[in-house]
Amino acid sequence: MRFDLITLFPEFFHSPLQSGLIAKAIAKGLAEVHCTNPRDFTCDRHHKVDDEPYGGGAGMVLKPEPLAAALESLPVVTPRQVIYLSPQGEPMTQALFQDLATSVEQLVLVCGHYEGIDERVMTWIDREISLGDFVLTCGEIPALALLNGVLRLRPGTIGKEESHRCDSFSDGLLDYPHYTRPAEFRGLKVPEVLLSGNHGAIAAWRRQQQLERTRDRRPDLYQAWQAQQSDLDSH
């Protein structure tokens, strides 16, 4: 899968691309990640990429010419999506990651800055995606989150694909608690059911933990899950 990052700060990605899951996926040939800097497509000696907004107002706006030129310079691998990371976009979810991981072979991620990009650049954008209902100083942070979330769902990236099938949100619920050795740590014991070897009992315990956690910590998700179950039962 190919990822193209349109970014004013390619150095932001140097460490993440050289460590952990992303680096391993690149080394195995499962992913290509390329950074393209709009400054390289400017014509003035100061490599100016922003300007004051028409109509006045605070902040600066990214100019259309260097962004459009950067986007048009990229090779096209189909199917692909061009995504602008923006607080106005649809929120990132596990379902969104799963959809992108299975439906596209190229993701172009446009990292915004300042007050945003000139609206005319939206001609090149397929969709806007947001990390959440808050504002950050740059689009590189949500771009990295999106890259990581999608890439880990691609076949071969994670050793055991069962790992991501059991992730939080994969079935609309939060994850269950995890334990490892030792069986007792500073007086805190692993639940007996996990030591029993009874796979049916373990599965039931984990499901109950998922339900309780989701109900207590994310009642919005729990209500959505209940509604989904009601729909399934009615059919």
Swiss-Prot record:
It is found in: Cytoplasm. One of its GO terms (cellular component) is cytosol. It is an enzyme of class 2 (transferase). The keyword tRNA processing applies. SUPFAM superfamilies: alpha/beta knot. Pfam families: tRNA_m1G_MT (PF01746). Disulfide bonds: none annotated. Its EC number is 2.1.1.228. One of its GO terms (biological process) is tRNA N1-guanine methylation. The keyword Ribonucleoprotein does not apply. It comes from the Bacteria. It catalyses: guanosine(37) in tRNA + S-adenosyl-L-methionine = N(1)-methylguanosine(37) in tRNA + S-adenosyl-L-homocysteine + H(+). Its main location: cytoplasm. Keywords: Cytoplasm, Methyltransferase, S-adenosyl-L-methionine, Transferase, tRNA processing. GO terms for molecular function: tRNA (guanine(37)-N1)-methyltransferase activity. Specifically methylates guanosine-37 in various tRNAs. Belongs to the RNA methyltransferase TrmD family. HAMAP family: TrmD. Homodimer. This is tRNA (guanine-N(1)-)-methyltransferase. It comes from Synechococcus elongatus (strain ATCC 33912 / PCC 7942 / FACHB-805). The gene is trmD.
